[in-house]
Each structure stands twice: as C-alpha cells, then as structure tokens.
Amino acid sequence: MTNLRKSHPILKIINSSLVDLPVPVSISSWWNFGSLLMACLAVQILTGLFLAMHYTSDTATAFNSVTHICRDVNYGWIIRYLHANGASMFFICLYLHIGRGLYYGSYLYSETWNIGILLLFATMATAFMGYVLPWGQMSFWGATVITNLLSAIPYVGTDLVQWIWGGFSVDKATLTRFFAFHFLLPFIIAALAMVHLLFLHETGSNNPTGIPSDTDMIPFHPYHTIKDILGLMLMLSVLSALVLFSPDLLGDPDNYTPANPLNTPPHIKPEWYFLFAYAILRSIPNKLGGVLALVLSILVLAVIPFLHTSKQRSMMFRPLSQCLFWILTSDLLILTWIGGQPVEHPYIIIGQVASIMYFTIILIIMPLTSLLENHLLKW
C-alpha cells in the first residue's frame, strides 16, 4: 500500500513541495530565506489578526486604541511590538533573499523572479499602509507626503490623490481604507507566494555554482528542513531580543505624538526599510522625476535578467562581478543612511552621487564587467 502522503490528493501536493522535493545538495544557508519569509508572513498575519480585534480605524480613537492595546490588553504590548518589529525582520529577510538571487543568478528563472518583484511591491504597499494605522505624527505626515507623490502624474494626478484620500486631505476615510487594504494584502501576498513557489518547483532550485544539478539531488526532508529550522530559530532569537530589549529601536519617536495636521514634524521620513528609495526620490529636484526614480529603483530588478551578459550564471567564480556586487550593497547602505538625514549639505550631494551610482552599476557597469570576464576567460 502506498504511503498516505503520496496518495492523498492534498497531502501529495504538500509532500511534493516540502517532503520529497528534490533539492540540490550544494545549496547553502542563503537558500533559507524563502522559508523564513513564510514564517515572517505567518507571524505578521497572526499578530495582525489579534491587533485588529482591538484596533479602531477612526481618526478620533485610532491612537488611543493602540495605547489601549499596549496598556490594557493582556500581552497586547508584546503582540504590538512583535508585529512592528516582525515587519523589520520581514524586510531584512526580503532584501537578503533578493541579494542572494542577484549574486547567484537566480533571476534567470524569469517567472519566479517577476512574481518575486510583484511580492516586493505588495509587501512595500502593505508596510506603508500599516505605518499609517497608529495615527501618530509620522503616520499622518508620511501618508500625506507619500500619497501626494501621485499628484506628479500628468492630467489625472490631483484627482487620483483625492480619490485615494477620499476627500481633500488625509482623514477618516483614508485611515479606514488603509486599514481595510492592510488587512487584505497579506492574504494576497500569501497567494502570490504560492504562485512564486509553483514556478520555482517547475524549474527546481538554483545552487551556488550556477551549474545544473539534476544528477546530484537530495530530498528536502529531513536535510533542508533541519537547516531551515536552524535559520528559523536564529531569526526568532533576534526578533525576540529586539521585541523584549529595545522594541522602539527601529521606530520613530514622533509616532508617539498623536497626529496633528497643524504641526509638521521637523523631518518627515518613512521606516528604515524604505529609506534607500526615499533617498533616491529626494535626490532629484523635480517632483515627477523623483517619483519615476523611486518606482524605477525597484522596477530596475525586472530588467536584470535581460542584462545578464556573462557565460556563467553565478558570481561564485567571477571576482570582478563580486566586487561590484559588494560596492552596490555598500551604495544601498549609504542611501539608507542618507534617507534618514535632513536635506542639507553635504547629505544632498552624497545622496545624488549614491543614486547615480545605484543605477549606473546595475544598468551599465555590471553587464560590461560580465563581458570583460568572458573575454578574460577566453569564452
């Protein structure tokens, strides 16, 4: 008699995805982040569900309802901080996952890569709307500034902004709809993640060498489940330390002041995980140009498969490309730092140089370096 997990209509799908899935023997811990992201999403949905039971999406009571969760609800403070810092862990895993894809050439699985870009956009939208919900100063002004960027779209911009706001400013209607979408989007992200996984399992995983490994596979369970559980334990340890020792480390103190439309904070900035894109937006003095640069800073990932000029898939044996990859990583860290600084000299010029470097490395220098490496290897 066949094993139930191989014959049951539902269990056999789970079995082929998580138990008997053939996986390259050489994949490293950099391949853990997919499962970590699913764990982060599960944590976010669960904590978010419990927060939504006590939260009220009304401008008059939203701030007080968050205070009530932290002070009066049993373990409300830990649920709230798990949710807030869980988002930071989500983005850390997300950026490392994308970085691994870039380094090892996983972007050549174009369907999986493009679904991944959609997932990134959906996650960023969810995080932005979630940041608005506590209705503190930075929530209100962040929502005002970021939604206002859409007014740069010719002809329809102003109407579009007022349509999103549900009025002539960020108000009750805006908060209510942001709460509705913030609740809905994680489930759309979960569905997209399933599609992402579906396309990945059509081709099988890439590996650090970038060489097809059809002849050298091992089952996902128990080998990679153990490895993934180790990664999960490490991530949960970091998240627990963050939540229990310094829960406000990554937040903004301005968000502990209730939203006041008559008082603008001295420095409006988003959460740390958007600062690199915010720095690119601010580095262009023109509004429409800034918005286009902001969108392209993420959308540039979609053209990377077309710019792959190397004869090798992975960067494992390409030292020049490796140097460029780490320069790009440093550039992103500089942009993140600049995004959190005030708009004054010398931060403006540093941001502009770093923004130009970001696009130049990805669109011009990396493809040319790959061609040079091909030539050096006489390919």
Swiss-Prot record:
Bilayer topology term: Multi-pass membrane protein
Keywords, comma-separated and alphabetical: Electron transport, Heme, Iron, Membrane, Metal-binding, Mitochondrion, Mitochondrion inner membrane, Respiratory chain, Transmembrane, Transmembrane helix, Transport, Ubiquinone
Substitution effect: T215I: In strain: Isolate TK 15708 and Isolate TK 18513
Primary location recorded for the protein, binned into one broad class: mitochondrion
Entry GO MF terms: metal ion binding; ubiquinol-cytochrome-c reductase activity
Outcome of substituting D214N: In strain: Isolate TK 18513
Extra information: Heme 1 (or BL or b562) is low-potential and absorbs at about 562 nm, and heme 2 (or BH or b566) is high-potential and absorbs at about 566 nm.
Protein name (database record): Cytochrome b
Bilayer-crossing regions: 33-53, 77-98, 113-133, 178-198, 226-246, 288-308, 320-340, 347-367
Listed cofactors: heme b
Quaternary state and interactors: The cytochrome bc1 complex contains 11 subunits: 3 respiratory subunits (MT-CYB, CYC1 and UQCRFS1), 2 core proteins (UQCRC1 and UQCRC2) and 6 low-molecular weight proteins (UQCRH/QCR6, UQCRB/QCR7, UQCRQ/QCR8, UQCR10/QCR9, UQCR11/QCR10 and a cleavage product of UQCRFS1). This cytochrome bc1 complex then forms a dimer.
GO biological process, one term: mitochondrial electron transport, ubiquinol to cytochrome c
Residues the record lists as binding heme b b566: H97, H196
Organism placement in taxonomy: Eukaryota, Metazoa, Chordata, Craniata, Vertebrata
Residues at which a ubiquinone binds: H201
Positions contributing to heme b b562 binding: H83, H182
One of the record's GO cellular component terms: mitochondrial inner membrane
Effect of I211V: In strain: Isolate CN 97682
Family listed: Belongs to the cytochrome b family.
Cofactor binding note: Binds 2 heme b groups non-covalently.
Physiological role: Component of the ubiquinol-cytochrome c reductase complex (complex III or cytochrome b-c1 complex) that is part of the mitochondrial respiratory chain. The b-c1 complex mediates electron transfer from ubiquinol to cytochrome c. Contributes to the generation of a proton gradient across the mitochondrial membrane that is then used for ATP synthesis.
InterPro entries per UniProt: Cyt_b/b6_C (IPR005798), Cyt_b/b6_C_sf (IPR036150), Cyt_b/b6_N (IPR005797), Cytb/b6-like_sf (IPR027387), Cytochrome_b (IPR030689), Cytochrome_b_C_euk/bac (IPR048260), Cytochrome_b_N_euk/bac (IPR048259), Di-haem_cyt_TM (IPR016174)
Subcellular location: Mitochondrion inner membrane
